[in-house]
A protein has these predicted regions:
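Conserved alpha/beta-hydrolase "acid-adjacent" motif
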Residues: 143-148
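Gly/Ala-rich beta-loop-alpha elbow adjacent to hydrolase catalytic centers
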Residues: 12, 16, 20
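Short beta-strand immediately N-terminal to the catalytic nucleophile in serine-hydrolase-like folds
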Residues: 10-12, 37
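Conserved acidic catalytic loop of the alpha/beta-hydrolase fold
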Residues: 1-8
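Flexible "cap/lid" loop of the alpha/beta hydrolase fold
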Residues: 21-26, 31-65, 69
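Conserved alpha/beta-hydrolase catalytic His-Asp/Glu region
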Residues: 45-50, 63-126
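Short beta-strand/loop motif that positions the catalytic acidic residue
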Residues: 130, 136-138
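Catalytic active-site module of serine/aspartate enzymes centered on a nucleophile-bearing elbow/loop
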Residues: 159-212
């Protein structure tokens, strides 16, 4: 509203992707399309307790050790080391920029956002009702996002799923050319009026389509 933009293609990664999904739920008439990238951490029911526990550990580390010390550990998580292996210089810049964030702001975000947000598995009704063209995008080594990505693909009638090979969580930084190409192709199809809704026949209780 402040920018006086009536409708837009909305692209978000990680927490931004979660916000993008909710934008589609709440303001579908304002979204030309949605790119929901790297979304799903802590979504699976069996992982929720551990995820909330780790959120508490992260917040405590931020407040007690400060942002620089935290960034030096967090950057080497299991879904971020892929970036270091591909582009050490880019990864070093990522880590430096991360260290400049506010420790208090980051801790509050962990506690009040990450720790309190609903599981994607509790939002299935909202997904099924949404018709905004949606691209679900994830890296194939962004382990916490793989099953939730399949969930969103299955439950959002207007969604497609793209998986970037040998990529972790920071897919827009790890392989910006591929990321931008996938997103650009998607937006181009939407703008051309060629983005389809899924044929209802594509979802069936049958595995082969040949029911006995």
């Amino acid at each position: 509203d402040h920018l006086e933009i009536e409708r837009a293609h909305v692209v978000g990664l990680s927490m931004g992707g979660f916000a993008t999904l909710h934008f589609g739920f709440r303001h579908p008439s304002r979204a030309l399309s949605l790119v929901v990238a790297g979304v799903g951490y802590g979504a699976e029911k069996e992982q929720q307790a551990r995820f909330k526990e780790e959120v508490g550990v992260v917040a405590k580390s931020l407040l007690e050790e400060g942002m620089a010390a935290f960034a030096g550990k967090y950057a080497y998580g299991p879904t971020r080391v892929q970036f270091e292996n591909k582009d050490p210089r880019g990864f070093a810049e990522f880590k430096r920029a991360l260290a400049e964030h506010s420790a208090l702001g980051s801790a509050n975000t962990q506690i009040s956002c990450q720790g309190e947000r609903p599981s994607l598995y509790d939002l299935i009704a909202e997904m099924r009702a949404m018709t905004v063209p949606t691209l679900v995008l994830t890296g194939d080594e962004d382990w916490p996002c793989l099953a939730p990505a399949l969930l969103m693909k299955r439950e959002i009638p207007s969604a497609a799923l793209a998986v970037m090979p040998n990529c972790g969580h920071t897919i827009n930084l790890e392989d910006p050319d591929q990321f931008n190409r996938i997103v650009g192709d998607f937006i181009g199809q939407v703008d051309a009026g060629r983005w389809p809704r899924r044929d209802p026949r594509a979802l069936s209780a049958s595995i082969t389509g040949m029911k006995g």
